[in-house]
Amino acid sequence: MKQITVALAGQPNVGKSSLINAISNAKLKVGNFSGVTVEKTEVVFTICDEFSCENYETHIIDLPGAYSLTEYTIEEKVTKSFIQSDEYDIIVNVVDSTNLQRNLLFTTQLLETGKKVIVALNMSDEAREEGIEIDEKQLSKILGVPCIKTAASTGEGIDELKEAIVEIYHKKETTAKVIYSDPIEEEIQHIVNFLKEKHYRSKLSYRLLALKLLQEDADIYRKMHDEPIWIEILPLVRDALGHLYLHHNTKDLKEIFEEEHFAFAKGAKMEVMSTKSMKAKNLTQKIDILLINKFLGIPLFLFFMWLLFQLTFELGSIPMDYIDTAFSWMGEQAKL
């Protein structure tokens, strides 16, 4: 039986654990990631591919929730370290469908890793209740990876997710893509053309390699430093970076690519997501709409503060009267 290892990645509170629990006949293993006390959750189950009549032992590693591939927290450090390793075959990026744009910021970083990625648009049922509609097919075209609507609470999309895992597993390389602004795309293309001209052999696609060179990826720089092509490509990369610094008016590459990720996530969201007004709203939503109204919000706040003040003294006077009476009676008794 073939084994598929899946890294389950996503921001905090996107329903990763619920999605794991929704997988039938799951066997849960709990431990720690190597060298740290962060809990490691692993699920083992079997996927039966109906087309090939073959079974796959699938291991899902639930990575700690992270907002980005940085090392600001121990959870992000663990997630980044695992994502950069070769200990898995596929990334399943769990996304909160009710907060698409913010979640896509993390998705763009995962797409840049060069790994095989599947996007699970989780909490789709909650999104529909809020009037949010996402065109998952269009999003799949934009990202270059499968995008599947899931709802852990109802089991929606679980079978489709399993099928996608097997399908992506058999693909030789990822088709993930992130589209950048014209200046960056032009510099990427210049480097790609140079690599093609030199027939450079790389495990990464030329586009991904060019991107990592522009991002000054330490591992790529270390690997290519001792290769003959390094002397020729370094001036090209430096010129490209000079153009980017000039265009973005900063030499902070982190800031440059954060802006690019934000623009890409915002553009993708605007293209695939629509929101319709919901006629039926629950009590909480109705109260929220009333309290955050730009005209009524502040007056209502002041009214409730006044009401709280009045209730504190009016209601508080009742037990105080009883207490005063009790102490007066006790005082009288003491005099006897």
Enumerate the predicted regions with their spans.
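Signal for well-folded cores of large energy- and translation-related assemblies
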Residues: 24, 68, 83-84, 111, ...
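Extended helical scaffolds that flank P-loop GTPase cores
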Residues: 173-336
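Short flexible coil/turn linkers enriched for glycine and charged/polar residues
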Residues: 1-2, 13, 52-54, 113, ...
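Conserved C-terminal guanine-recognition region of P-loop GTPase G domains, centered on the G4
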Residues: 45-52, 78-147
